[in-house]
Amino acid sequence: MPKSPPGIRLLRSLLRAGKQQRSMLSGIINGPMLQPKRKRARKAVQQPSKAKTEITASAIQARANARAGPTTVPGKWIASTYCARPLPASLPARRLAYWLYLPNHMPTATARRGSPMIVMLHGCHQSATQFAEGTRMNQLAEAKGYAVLYPQQSVTAQSQRCWQWYAESTQHGDGETALLAGLIESVCLQYAIDRQRIYACGISAGAGMAAVLALNHPEMIAAVGLHSGPVFGAARSQIEAVHVMRHGAGAPPEHAIRSLLLRRAA
């Protein structure tokens, strides 16, 4: 049976992640934010049995393996942190954790020009390593010889790890847009990346953030892939963002996109 084209395999990977993301989003919308927690009855303290201790140790090891990321692909799996330069008279510099996959094998033409790079933006309640595992993007990257960058939203910045695509400063190119653009530039300076072939891809809140990043930096992002994401300009606050997640966007995005392009041209 002939292999599916790379675009079809990418879509299938995102569909798998999309199923997981829908269950997570239902927890955000219908979960603790809208329903009070029930009080639990107190239970007597019991000493853990040997079997329970072994299960707990196994669970801890499993979580450690998840943080370590995919281990079945021969390329390099690099975990690091990007620290943005603070502007004068601004808040302390913000830090952004990220993971980077570099393929073990590259075609000769790719090696001469540098690796193409896909920036993968996870959804709410996800981590970068979970997104990498769920989409299997590293396996595809190894087969084709391109790098994959996985930024990870901080729980300090957003308690549910949602990218703040809805923030007005972010939509205008500041905030998390500037942070991600700075991270991409930093990675390009450290590794042999083909700057003409940098792509952004995301799911849910990550899709919204990928669209904002591409619209504000068309000179940096060659193309975008969006899955289950809000349209640009659909919300300007967290409350509006939750409404969009539940009911969709009412107004078409053309006006917001046109306004952004006019600001860039000015």
Roles of regions detected by a PLM:
Residues 95, 114-115, 145, 195, ...:
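A structure-centric signal for secondary-structure junctions around beta-strands
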